[in-house]
């Protein structure tokens, strides 16, 4: 939303430095985030850089307050600030990666007319089998038990919703600008891989869980690059991610930054 992070920017010098760094790398980002029109901020190429700065600013503020994470994860775009927090990427490189990601995913959203719907109250295997009945519909976000978001061709999404309802589930169409985390985004993954190969990649200093697998990130540089790049065109297995993070940990010590 317009104005997100503005209070922190005004009150926290480190947050201000972070936003100012983003502004120096991509002029106009801070104005769109703090003062722009809502329609402008919802454009993928603007949303992603603004969310990156806001996510990381609040995570760092918690750390400065003595609340340091021993494990992190992010949903979709949120995985990139989590990578910066975990020391896998420098803040500057992570922001540059987000700019590439947002720009390319925005372009592909224009190229491919996509739609998305949440499939509710059905087992994952039922939703997956229903997706296979269509040429270009895929499960993309495994959010929680009984809730899987599916995306793909805008021409097929209504029929997919009808098929979900026929099988006893609920289907809710979602207002999105593109079919993210589908094969439509393969070109974005390729662009990200090229960019990552020119960046310094470090082993995680804080345990970080990958959207694509729901498991901790690998330590090997080539595998880290592959995991980050393919995330844009792969399903987000967030239910598995949370289950694995909570294994052996207390839920009351979990913080969610949106």
Mark where each language-model region is.
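FabD-like malonyl-/acyl-CoA
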Residues: 1-129, 174, 254-257
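Generic recognition of short, well-ordered alpha-helical segments
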Residues: 3-6, 187, 240
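Alpha/beta catalytic cores of group-transfer enzymes, especially the acyltransferase/condensing modules
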Residues: 23-30, 36, 86-235
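Short phosphate-binding/catalytic loops that engage adenosine nucleotides
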Residues: 67, 169, 250
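A short, well-structured juxtamembrane/interface segment
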Residues: 236-244
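Glycine-rich anion-binding loop/nest that anchors nucleotide
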Residues: 243-246, 251-258
């Amino acid at each position: 939303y317009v104005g997100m992070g503005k209070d922190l920017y005004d009150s926290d010098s480190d947050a201000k430095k972070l936003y100012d760094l983003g502004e120096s790398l991509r002029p106009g980002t801070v104005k769109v985030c703090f003062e722009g029109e809502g329609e402008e901020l919802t454009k993928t190429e603007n949303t992603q850089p603004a969310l990156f700065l806001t996510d990381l600013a609040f995570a760092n503020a918690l750390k400065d307050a003595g609340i340091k994470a021993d494990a992190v994860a992010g949903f979709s775009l949120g995985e990139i600030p989590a990578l910066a927090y975990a020391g896998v990427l420098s803040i500057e490189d992570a922001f540059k990666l987000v700019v590439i990601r947002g720009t390319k995913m925005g372009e592909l959203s224009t190229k491919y007319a996509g739609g998305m719907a949440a499939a509710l109250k059905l087992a994952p295997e039922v939703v997956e089998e229903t997706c296979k009945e269509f040429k270009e519909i895929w499960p993309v976000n495994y959010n929680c038990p009984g809730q899987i978001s599916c995306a793909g061709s805008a021409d097929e999404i209504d029929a997919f919703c009808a098929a979900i309802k026929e099988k006893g589930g609920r289907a809710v169409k979602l207002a999105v600008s593109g079919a993210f985390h589908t094969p439509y985004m393969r070109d974005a993954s390729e662009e990200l891989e090229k960019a990552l190969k020119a960046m310094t990649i470090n082993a995680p200093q804080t345990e970080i869980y990958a959207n694509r697998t729901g498991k901790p990130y690998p330590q090997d540089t080539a595998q880290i690059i592959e995991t980050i790049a393919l995330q844009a065109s792969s399903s987000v297995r967030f239910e598995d991610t949370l289950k694995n993070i909570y294994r052996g940990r207390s839920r009351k010590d979990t913080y969610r930054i949106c």
